[in-house]
Amino acid sequence: MGSRLHVQEIQGGPPLPYEDDIRAFCKEYAELLDAHDPLRRFRDEFIVPSKKDLKRKTLFPNDETEETSDEECIYLCGNSLGLQPRSTRKYIEYYLRTWATKGVTGHFVPHDDQLLPPFVNVDEAGAKLMAPIVGALKSEVAVMGTLTANLHLLMASFYRPTRERYKIIIEGKAFPSDHYAVESQIRHHNLDPKDAMVLIESDDLDRPILDTEYILRVIDENAHSTALILLSAIQFYTGQYFDIQRITAHAQSKGILVGWDCAHAAGNVDLRLHDWNVDFAAWCTYKYLNAGPGGMAALFVHERHGRVDMEQAASGKEAFHPRFSGWWGGDKQTRFLMNNHFVPQQGAAGFQLSNPSVLDMNAVVASLELFNQTSMAEIRKKSLNLTGYLEHLLLRDPQTESSEKRPFSIITPSNPAERGAQLSIRLQPGLLDRVLESLDEDAVIIDERKPDVIRVAPAPLYNTYVEVWRFAQLFHLACDKALRGRE
């Protein structure tokens, strides 16, 4: 196949340039898509584990793995843990050098060659870079804490049950930590989750998707008794991308506050948290945002909830939205006066508790700097193409195009507007372990959700069309091998 093949610029998803082209199943086609990818340079900004790295039982090279290939693995697991940016090491080394050579003065003294401002201001640097990724004002974002801890802090502020309004609505198959957090918040207020926790459940096990109309119906049925809604922007299991704007507006019209867990959405889809009038949100940074395992999380508080009346606060009156408070959330002009009179910073920064880990912040910023070299609109555009190509290769393969021949189905919505990068693939019963074993032998990194689902998520900053093509070939072979082994 020559370069005469025309590759369109995709706007908003299908129809894709490969939709009716049998050549889409050739490696050369994927190579051409990569050649036309405006984000292809970012691949080199990340460290991709090699087959040798994965097989080696030590962190550093030894003689046992010399015969293993240096070829890079196929890493399609950015929805679980993003790859390490090459710049992360440099940022952390600069932090360690500052600490080693400046000690406590590193909190306040700037340097000509610094990558981040002095320790006392690193949180501002993180918020500035994070805000455009989630469609927020800088003042609406704080990079702090961890995801579940931040959800607890936000619910402590926004879940204020009354005799009439006391329920929290959450999806029935929410990530367990979210479920635990909501349940414990309800118990903390001496309420019974059986009465105060509304679970939105799908009644179709073969299609565990929550249609927007159904969600709105559940809201209507519980409107007069609901205080808060907490939903996932993208559902971790199915990969469904909820209609944040519509659900938020509908719930708020009923007097309900709305929060979103954006763990699988931040760095994945083009969020507009401010414009969509979201009350609050929280997310981690170790998935699509590539800040490392357990990396520092972030939260969003809409500006209308973050305002502080400084005159009222100075007189000791309640002048801000209730929250759990800590010294790092205090006004910078008075933070070090130690006078025990708390006046919060304006915006989300006023929800901070302790000084942030500068070590963790460096890992966050190293990745965010890459995101800020492009835009979420461009990242989302490639993601629509990349995941659409993956879906096409899985479902339209000439060998298994008939659904009756396929030993799997895709439970993620087929509408690209209703999903992010991830496709959740449900295998026929009894195939999962065999398929995973084959993929592992071929150094393919994805993740599983028992009993029968694998999640595959091409990350547009570092994954390529050729990788997606290679995965599809290996996945079909793994399925064939698993079927033969079951006979």
Swiss-Prot record:
It is found in: Cytoplasm. The modification N6-(pyridoxal phosphate)lysine is found at residue 287. This is Kynureninase 1. Homodimer. Pathway: Amino-acid degradation; L-kynurenine degradation; L-alanine and anthranilate from L-kynurenine: step 1/1; Cofactor biosynthesis; NAD(+) biosynthesis; quinolinate from L-kynurenine: step 2/3. Its EC number is 3.7.1.3. One of its GO terms (biological process) is quinolinate biosynthetic process. Pyridoxal 5'-phosphate binds at residues 147-148, 175-178, 232, 261, 264, 286, 327, 355. Catalyzes the cleavage of L-kynurenine (L-Kyn) and L-3-hydroxykynurenine (L-3OHKyn) into anthranilic acid (AA) and 3-hydroxyanthranilic acid (3-OHAA), respectively. It is an enzyme of class 3 (hydrolase). InterPro entries: Kynureninase, PyrdxlP-dep_Trfase, PyrdxlP-dep_Trfase_major, PyrdxlP-dep_Trfase_small. One of its GO terms (cellular component) is cytoplasm. Its cofactor is pyridoxal 5'-phosphate. It catalyses: L-kynurenine + H2O = anthranilate + L-alanine + H(+); 3-hydroxy-L-kynurenine + H2O = 3-hydroxyanthranilate + L-alanine + H(+). Belongs to the kynureninase family. Its main location: cytoplasm. It holds the Pfam family KYNU_C. Keywords: Cytoplasm, Hydrolase, Pyridine nucleotide biosynthesis, Pyridoxal phosphate. GO terms for molecular function: kynureninase activity; pyridoxal phosphate binding.
